[in-house]
Amino acid sequence: MRKSYRIKKEAEFQQVFETRNSVANRQFVVYSMEKPQQPHFRVGISVGKKIGNAVHRNWVKRRIRQSLLELKPHLKQDVDFLVIARPRADGISMTDAKRSLVHVLKLAKLLDSDYSEE
């Protein structure tokens, strides 16, 4: 995913947190904020230190990024959102990660209504 699709600055993370629009499941928490003037979505990924060591945290981030890349055409475009991994996300398989992410994104109403898992 290109850098223009990422949220990196702490101030931008805080702005999304402060909207308090969140949904969660066992593996992920998603915070979202509408940005109507924005041409495409932006995402921030956070994996805390409760999830293993740096290798495990980066592994989880790669799984999240790949799942979002596959879901990109179906995601709502005028929004900033954060995906926060919970400790239960450690060791999750790619298919389970995508399934869990689809579930939480549907709860947050960030996926197109016509999306169905292949």
Curated annotation (Swiss-Prot):
One of its GO terms (molecular function) is 3'-tRNA processing endoribonuclease activity. InterPro entries: Ribosomal_Su5_D2-typ_SF, Ribsml_uS5_D2-typ_fold_subgr, RNase_P. It catalyses: Endonucleolytic cleavage of RNA, removing 5'-extranucleotides from tRNA precursor. Keywords: Endonuclease, Hydrolase, Nuclease, RNA-binding, tRNA processing. GO terms for cellular component: ribonuclease P complex. Its EC number is 3.1.26.5. It is an enzyme of class 3 (hydrolase). Consists of a catalytic RNA component (M1 or rnpB) and a protein subunit. Belongs to the RnpA family. This is Ribonuclease P protein component.
